[in-house]
Regions:
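Catalytic phosphate-handling regions of large nucleic-acid enzymes and associated NTPases
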Residues: 2, 47-50, 58, 101, ...
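Short, hydrophobic transmembrane alpha-helix segments
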Residues: 52-53, 74-78
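Alpha-helical repeat scaffolds in large eukaryotic proteins
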Residues: 68-71, 182
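Active-site flanking loop/helix segments enriched in acidic
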Residues: 40-65, 160-164
Length: 239
């Protein structure tokens, strides 16, 4: 975890409360996990600016701003009463909820048809087909692309293609967040002996869904003796 982000994180009242709890209860592994997730999220989110420069706020500043807002949104007396799992999940869901805005490079190349046929495995073929169906819904833009290519205005045509890809990434990012969490963090989001990976993925997915999705969530996850994670609470705050 870089020094700048460490300083920013330490300013968050939510993190301060988590850190206080973990130090008091000798749960340093929880803080270490937050550090690992922070490094992963911040490094990965840098590619958002690379691929979609208009989304400049999906970075560590955006994460810090969200944690600051959450710290103001939750009254101090309520914050003091939150369980350690609640605090932990609030922080890591903020870190990872937009991770789907940063797809693996191979998917972007597949959507742009910039891979050789030999490079397309079953997953990439499926992704290319899903994007192709999505692209067809942008009727006017596709017509403009074809016209510009006929006029040999290739750079202008590519700008429109990039716009459609950006919209696809944005509209599917919560699904992708769940997939990325499953791929890179399966079995690693653990508090005490409780695996919270699936709960984290569900919470991150929920932030882009209708509020009615929250009604389908489990209410609590037992995380140890007299310790519980309130899943809908974290999901509501994240929204």
């Amino acid at each position: 975890m870089n020094k700048y982000w460490e300083n920013q994180l330490n300013k968050s009242v939510v993190y301060q409360k988590l850190k206080s709890n973990c130090v008091r209860n000798n749960q340093h592994e929880v803080l270490a996990l937050v550090e690992k997730i922070s490094t992963f999220a911040i490094e990965r989110l840098k590619t958002v600016i690379k691929n979609m420069p208009e989304f400049t706020l999906h970075d560590d500043t955006h994460i810090y701003n969200m944690l600051t807002i959450i710290g103001k949104l939750i009254p101090q007396e309520k914050l003091r009463k939150l369980s350690t799992p609640d605090l932990f999940m609030l922080i890591i869901s903020v870190l990872l909820h937009d991770i789907g805005m940063a797809p693996d490079e191979k998917y972007i190349l597949a959507w742009k048809n910039q891979l050789s046929e030999a490079e397309y495995d079953e997953t990439l073929i499926e992704e290319r087909e899903k994007f192709a169906r999505f692209r067809l819904t942008y009727t006017h833009q596709v017509e403009d692309i074809e016209r510009l290519r006929e006029e040999q205005e290739f750079s202008k045509a590519q700008l429109i293609e990039d716009y459609i890809i950006t919209e696809y990434i944005r509209m599917t990012h919560s699904i992708r967040a769940r997939e990325i969490i499953a791929k890179y963090w399966a079995g690693k989001i653990v508090y005490q002996d409780t695996d919270l990976t699936e709960d984290l993925a569900t919470i991150c997915f929920s932030h882009n869904e209708s509020y009615t999705y929250l009604l389908q969530m489990e209410n609590f996850r037992v995380c140890g003796q007299d310790e519980y994670l309130c899943i809908p609470f974290v999901a509501v705050v994240l929204r």
